[in-house]
UniProtKB/Swiss-Prot annotation:
This is Nucleoid-associated protein CPn_0039/CP_0736/CPj0039/CpB0043. The keyword Mitochondrion does not apply. Keywords: Cytoplasm, DNA-binding. It comes from Chlamydia pneumoniae. NCBIfam families: DNA_YbaB_EbfC. Binds to DNA and alters its conformation. May be involved in regulation of gene expression, nucleoid organization and DNA protection.
């Protein structure tokens, strides 16, 4: 019984280390979404933190601010979809 417990404890320690490494790598990953043929682009990390937003001045219309809002939402959605796909793949390879 003792050796089985030690083995499980060692496996748990390895899984914990893998999880911590994966979590740290999420901060380094970058996912970009663009909308309006590149008029707006956003970059997020693997924790869905917004890293950068770029807006081309040609899409700034004071008469129609909803355009920029729509483009921002679309770009963010694309970046998040990329992140979600990769996270799903990463989870499928985890042993737990």
């Amino acid at each position: 019984m003792g050796s089985g417990y030690a083995k499980k404890k060692k496996e748990a320690k390895i899984m914990e280390q893998q999880f911590l490494e994966m979590e740290a790598s999420l901060l380094e990953k970058r996912y970009e979404g663009q909308a309006g043929n590149g008029l707006v682009s956003v970059v997020i990390n693997g924790k869905c933190d917004l890293i950068s937003v770029k807006v081309q001045p040609t899409c700034l219309d004071p008469e129609d601010p909803e355009v920029i809002e729509d483009l921002f939402r679309a770009a963010f959605k694309l970046a998040k979809e990329q992140m979600d796909q990769e996270m799903s793949l990463m989870r499928s390879t985890m042993p737990f």
